């Protein structure tokens, strides 16, 4: 930007700062003024905005003049008599005005997230006496945003849903959900329903859909999902022989198939009426699945076969942009009402199957549950101060089931930040070698619920990119 514009920017920010201070100190003093407002120009207070007349790679910085913006961008109107504004609209979407950010010559507002039903490319400023001032301004509707899919392993021919934003169906350009067939070609799903607020779409998965990418296209562009349909990348436990891994700890958790199976065998936590107390007290015999790396050899084998260290099986590089995912089924007859599903990765220094030596490692721990019971003496981790995920969806309503269907659960690896009591800890897995062993244990977590006998079926435990 030119130097003169930088000076104007500083002036606008100073005026806005005065508005913040004066109005916040005396919030009850604000009164709309009389007269008609006017807008000289609009500045963006968000990071990246583009003028419609500029090159595609032009990126605006904080405070530059703009003629268009996207939903939820923050703008500063610069003009005169802006305290007379009683209501404001972009197209037919009303803006929520904060009087703390209104001054005579500046008005700071956020573009509504709502999608307009009538597009006029105008900003409307309305006074208390219903005088209306129009200002040319274009709202850029983004391409679809894809957040998640109800079940990434849903059967072909079944109905699934994707949640996101801007899932807009235009008569001239219908919304399309695209899967990939075995030849790498895109195949369209049959769309059944689109939410009125454009945040979800229900569809039938094509019969010829294969493992691969999913994309959604609208009149505003196309977006590829970060996840794949039937994603086998980073697979740790599929319980059908793909990785060959399963129980490898103190307990032989039930691995089976039945009429509810999603794709063959699954792991089951809780059965035969096993009860979780209100505080989900210790019951590893029924609610713990352990996979502890290593073997009974000396030195231990961590590079292949049953006992392979998980970091030698899947890619844990760039873990801040990855997540643990799995499919889960909780029948409505046995809802989950207590305890946290503690999801814990550990390095070889904390646990292995035998405790025998491992080439290249000075410190190797034997089998133990110190990270959960806190009864060890080998450091903070052995007292339970080691980061793990705490998945507890029942806390929203007091109980949780999946409605007798499979869903996909996503646990970002950046959320492995809780100690055994549910308190946040900075002692968390970060290096690739921190992801050698894995335990999934429903117990404790520092919350109290209702005594229950949940059945939790789990399949396709994997580590995949989410960004």
Q: Where are the regions a protein language model picked out?
A:
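C-terminal motif of bacterial Sec signal peptides marking the signal peptidase cleavage site
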Residues: 18-22
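Extra-cytoplasmic beta-strand recognition segments
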Residues: 239-241, 312-341, 411, 461
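Secreted extracellular polysaccharide-interacting domains
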Residues: 275-321, 350, 365-397
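Extracellular beta-strand elements of beta-rich domains used
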Residues: 456-463
């Amino acid at each position: 930007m030119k130097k003169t514009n930088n000076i104007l920017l500083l002036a606008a920010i100073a005026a806005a700062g005065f508005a913040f201070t004066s109005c916040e100190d005396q919030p009850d003093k604000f009164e709309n003024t009389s007269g008609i407002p006017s807008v000289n120009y609009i500045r963006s207070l968000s990071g990246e905005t583009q003028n419609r007349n500029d090159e595609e790679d032009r990126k605006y910085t904080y405070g530059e003049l703009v003629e268009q913006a996207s939903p939820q961008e923050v703008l500063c109107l610069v003009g005169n008599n802006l305290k007379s504004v009683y209501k404001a609209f972009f197209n037919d979407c009303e803006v929520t005005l904060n009087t703390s950010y209104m001054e005579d010559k500046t008005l700071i507002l956020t573009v509504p997230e709502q999608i307009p039903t009538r597009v006029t490319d105008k900003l409307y400023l309305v006074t208390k006496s219903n005088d209306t001032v129009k200002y040319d301004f274009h709202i850029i509707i983004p391409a679809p945003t894809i957040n998640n899919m109800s079940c990434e392993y849903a059967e072909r021919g079944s109905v699934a849903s994707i949640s996101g934003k801007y899932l807009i169906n235009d008569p001239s350009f219908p919304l399309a959900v695209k899967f990939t067939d075995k030849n790498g070609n895109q195949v369209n799903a049959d769309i059944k329903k689109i939410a009125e607020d454009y945040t979800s779409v229900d569809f039938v998965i094509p019969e010829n859909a294969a493992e691969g990418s999913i994309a959604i296209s609208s009149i505003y562009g196309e977006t590829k999902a970060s996840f794949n349909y039937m994603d086998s990348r980073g697979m740790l436990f599929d319980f059908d022989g793909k990785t060959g891994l399963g129980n490898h700890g103190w307990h032989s958790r039930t691995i089976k198939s039945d009429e509810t199976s999603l794709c063959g065998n699954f792991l089951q936590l809780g059965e035969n009426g096993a009860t979780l107390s209100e505080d989900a007290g210790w019951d590893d015999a029924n609610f713990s699945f352990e996979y502890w790396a290593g073997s009974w050899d000396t030195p231990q084998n961590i590079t292949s076969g049953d006992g392979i260290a998980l970091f030698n099986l899947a890619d844990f590089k760039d873990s801040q942009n990855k997540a643990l995912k799995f499919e889960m089924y909780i029948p409505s007859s046995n809802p989950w009402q207590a305890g946290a599903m503690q999801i814990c990765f550990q390095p070889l220094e904390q646990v292995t199957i035998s405790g025998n030596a491992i080439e290249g490692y000075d410190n190797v721990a034997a089998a133990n549950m110190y990270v959960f019971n806190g009864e060890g003496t080998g450091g903070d981790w052995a007292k339970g101060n080691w980061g793990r995920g705490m998945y507890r969806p029942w806390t929203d309503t007091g109980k949780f089931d999946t409605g007798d269907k499979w869903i996909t659960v996503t646990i970002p690896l950046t959320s492995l930040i809780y100690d055994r009591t549910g308190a946040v800890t900075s002692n968390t897995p970060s290096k690739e070698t921190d992801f050698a062993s894995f335990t999934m244990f429903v117990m404790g977590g520092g919350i109290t619920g209702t005594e229950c006998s949940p059945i939790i079926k789990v399949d396709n435990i994997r580590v995949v990119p989410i960004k």
